[in-house]
């Protein structure tokens, strides 16, 4: 495993995660409006900012895990497409164990659930595509 490229791929994944996340909320203000319909479920924005460092660390760890999985699945290196393929699997996993799980356990509506499912699925496809773009195996000399 190429640890320097793994670190760079993780960084690329983090950048992709946040760029997409900010762009998504800018392009889909209706999604933010949906979140605001559930003030008893979600923290107000000011309160979220107080715990945001923990969330950012968790996101970083999750993306590092995705990069390690990518490196183990593609030891000879890969492409954006192979990264997007892994992202599709991770995106489906996230939708099933996070988004649908929240729909069942939290008092939120189907509209917010659909927004989250589409947004988070695409986010992981993009993150892993960025990982696939950057990660390359170590150069070996015969």
For the regions a protein language model found, what residue spans apply to each?
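Juxtamembrane/disordered regions of integral membrane proteins
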Residues: 1-142
């Amino acid at each position: 495993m190429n640890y320097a490229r793994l670190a760079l791929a993780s960084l690329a994944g983090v950048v992709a995660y946040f760029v997409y996340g900010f762009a998504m909320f800018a392009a889909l203000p209706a999604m933010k409006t949906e979140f605001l319909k559930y003030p008893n479920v979600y923290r107000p924005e000011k309160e979220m900012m107080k715990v945001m460092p923990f969330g950012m660390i968790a996101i970083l760890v999750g993306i590092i895990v995705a990069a390690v999985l990518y490196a183990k699945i593609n030891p000879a290196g890969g492409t954006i497409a192979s990264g997007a393929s892994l992202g599709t699997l991770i995106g489906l996993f996230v939708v099933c164990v996070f988004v649908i799980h929240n729909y069942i356990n939290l008092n939120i509506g189907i509209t917010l659930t659909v927004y989250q499912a589409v947004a988070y699925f695409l986010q992981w496809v993009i993150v892993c595509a960025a990982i696939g773009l950057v990660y390359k195996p170590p150069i070996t000399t015969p």
